[in-house]
């Protein structure tokens, strides 16, 4: 067991959302945890408050005494801490391998898929908590009810996201897995081959033991395509009545979704029950169905499922409502923040906003994430961005990439302008975006701040400007 051989664990890039969660759980398990990061953020401050040593910047001395070094995927091989660890024959492992080790301490439930992982993981943790199962969880966003993205529970289960972006989910050995959907994203990891992408998800499902169970969303075309090749036990879920778990009578009730769940899963009591999900969007109905499937498999009651969904307080940056902000013109606008950065998830979130606030003007502030994604999905981006009532685009968040010709926000603005419906506003510097939005917004608007990069700082800046009015 790792606990007999490893005492000191050092994280390089500990401030990342996936890294910080694992570090916190290991700390609470009794390991001595340290870490380093170039920049302080809310995650590093939280870890420091727990007594974890977090170093600013990277130097070789930081790995002194470490038994193992966990490196974020964003950390390069030339990092002085990685170099020093290798020179001293200290194992250097990716985040997913350490997550796999955590699954040796608990029964693992791994949530994979191109979109919806964070929400589905959070909903699963919420229901298992309501069922009294006290799960451990590691989530790619802050669970609002817990105030953190990770927690060590006393129960037998660990619920965690499984990251397909770098194929690291193939390190995991869960007893249950979920595939929310499969889309053509991070295709450089798979040699731009859909067949290799499909095979990776099949291999992920097959990481389960023979007694495991997968929950697969048949509303996803790519998931349907892999079903004939899946040899481990699985159940399907979706909006079609051929699925083992499906939903009908879906209704928007303000910012909630009310629907009927039908269960025709082998080995389970057949029947139906009503639930209210405390978040908007048909895509979140699918995410809830996945969580319901897992919950039923571990023995949670219908009452616990209903309680966990109705009492769900959301997760950071997933349709996160900040409330009304004051505007210079004397009115107010509702501020919502979201991590969406792929056209498919953006379309789902925008549809959720329309469903929740059908009478309001929808203003979108968007920062594209990566030039390559903008290039590869350029037409899809122009289509989805053209569905809002007003649009402010800030420049692409590079995420370490070099600029790509005709794949920036200016190019997107030009393409949308040609379609004739919108006159996009271009804001080159994201730091200028809050003030620009204050000038654009009208009384009664819903402003959706969206993107996976530095645009995450905009809500706090808008709230600060609102206080000054």
From Swiss-Prot:
Q: Name the UniProt key words of this record, in alphabetical order.
A: ATP-binding, Cell cycle, Cell division, Cell shape, Cell wall biogenesis/degradation, Cytoplasm, Ligase, Nucleotide-binding, Peptidoglycan synthesis
Q: What is its EC number?
A: 6.3.2.8
List the record's Gene Ontology CC terms alphabetically: cytoplasm
Molecular function terms, GO-annotated: ATP binding; UDP-N-acetylmuramate-L-alanine ligase activity
| Catalytic activity from the UniProt record | UDP-N-acetyl-alpha-D-muramate + L-alanine + ATP = UDP-N-acetyl-alpha-D-muramoyl-L-alanine + ADP + phosphate + H(+)
Enumerate the subcellular locations listed in this protein's record, separating them with semicolons: Cytoplasm
Please list the residues that bind ATP. 113-119
Question: Has keyword Transferase?
Answer: no
* Protein role: Cell wall formation.
Q: What is the protein named?
A: UDP-N-acetylmuramate--L-alanine ligase
Organism, per UniProt?
Answer: Neisseria gonorrhoeae (strain ATCC 700825 / FA 1090)
Gene that produces this protein:
murC
């Amino acid at each position: 067991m790792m606990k007999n051989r490893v005492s000191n664990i050092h994280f390089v890039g500990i401030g990342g959302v996936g890294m910080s969660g694992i570090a916190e759980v290991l700390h609470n398990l009794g390991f001595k945890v340290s870490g380093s990061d170039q920049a302080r953020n809310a995650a590093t401050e939280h870890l420091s408050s727990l007594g974890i040593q977090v170093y600013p910047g990277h130097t070789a001395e930081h790995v002194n005494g470490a038994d193992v070094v966990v490196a974020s995927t964003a950390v390069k091989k030339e990092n002085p801490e990685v170099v020093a660890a290798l020179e001293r024959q200290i194992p250097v492992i990716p985040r997913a391998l350490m997550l796999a080790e955590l699954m040796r301490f608990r029964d693992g439930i791994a949530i994979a898929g191109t979109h919806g992982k964070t929400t589905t993981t959070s909903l699963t943790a919420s229901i298992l908590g309501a069922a009294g199962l006290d799960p451990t969880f590691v989530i790619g966003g802050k669970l609002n009810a817990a105030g953190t993205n990770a927690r060590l529970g006393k129960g037998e289960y660990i619920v965690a996201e499984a990251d397909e972006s770098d194929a690291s989910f193939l390190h995991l050995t869960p007893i249950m897995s979920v595939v929310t959907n499969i889309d053509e994203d991070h295709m450089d990891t798979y040699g731009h081959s859909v067949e290799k992408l499909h095979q990776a998800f099949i291999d992920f499902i097959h990481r389960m033991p023979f007694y495991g169970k997968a929950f697969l969303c048949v509303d996803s075309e790519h998931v349907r395509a892999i079903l004939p090749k899946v040899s481990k036990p699985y159940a399907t879920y979706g909006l079609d009545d051929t699925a083992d778990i499906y939903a009908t009578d879906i209704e928007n009730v303000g910012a909630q979704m009310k629907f009927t769940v039908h269960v025709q899963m082998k080995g389970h009591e057949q029947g139906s029950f009503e639930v209210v999900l405390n978040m908007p969007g048909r895509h979140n109905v699918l995410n809830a169905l996945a969580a319901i499937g897992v919950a039923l498999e571990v023995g949670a009651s219908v009452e616990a499922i209903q309680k966990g969904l109705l009492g769900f307080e959301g997760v950071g940056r997933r349709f996160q409502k900040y409330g009304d902000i004051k505007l210079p013109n004397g009115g107010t606008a509702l501020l919502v923040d979201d991590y969406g950065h792929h056209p498919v998830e953006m379309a789902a979130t925008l549809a959720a906003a329309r469903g929740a606030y059908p009478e309001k003007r929808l203003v979108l502030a968007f920062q594209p994430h990566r030039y390559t994604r903008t290039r590869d999905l350029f037409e899809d981006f122009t289509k989805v961005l053209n569905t809002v009532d007003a649009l402010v685009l800030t420049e692409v968040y590079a995420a370490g990439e070099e600029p790509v010709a005709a794949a920036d926000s200016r190019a997107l603005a030009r393409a949308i302008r040609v379609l004739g419906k919108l006159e996009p506003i271009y804001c080159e510097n994201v730091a200028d975006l809050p003030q620009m939005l204050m000038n654009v917004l009208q009384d009664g608007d819903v402003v959706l701040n969206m993107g996976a990069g530095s645009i995450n700082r905009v809500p706090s800046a808008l709230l600060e400007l609102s206080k000054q009015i």
